[in-house]
Amino acid sequence: MDSLLRIFPQKRRAFWQKTADSGKWVCEIRLRVDRPVIVETMRGDYFLNNSGGWQEHPYGAHLVTETEIRELIAWLCQDSVYAYADEIRQGFLTVEGGHRIGLCGQAVLENETGLRTLKNISFVNIRVSHEIRGAADDILPKLYKEGMFQNTLIVSPPGFGKTTLLR
């Protein structure tokens, strides 16, 4: 899955190649500073070892560094973090391929207007998008009444396919 591989900086792509090759099974990738990389798949959770291979236990797994997180954020923001300030303030970035990248760090507040930005980002959660053709086929006819599209609210817990349905 090329769009998944392009999330990562060029110099780290060889490390992520196996995960990208298994893209159709990957649901989420979790990167936390000083913690093992976790790859959540449709078949279970795995940890990445230092060569990018998958293993079932965290022992000897690759530990994410602050530098890796910083380089990833810079890459995702095309080296212009300020240009992405609004998205970062929302807590996530959306990248090519529809993948969503959640960010967690230290909140910087701005007077009474709320959150200004995040700094010291230490956790990145990559939600891998999957196109499922025909996902809305059963529900689409129910959204129309006498040829007019009806106001609709789609509600479900995280990870239950709201975005997939809309695609």
Residues covered by each model-derived region:
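Hydrophobic positions on the alpha1 helix immediately C-terminal to the Walker A/P-loop
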Residues: 165
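The conserved Walker
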Residues: 158
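Hydrophobic anchor at the beta1->P-loop junction of P-loop NTPases
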Residues: 154
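N-terminal accessory targeting/assembly segments
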Residues: 1-96
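P-loop NTP-binding catalytic core
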Residues: 71, 75, 79-148
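Walker A (P-loop) ATP-phosphate-binding motif of ABC ATPase nucleotide-binding domains
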Residues: 151
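Conserved lysine of the Walker
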Residues: 162
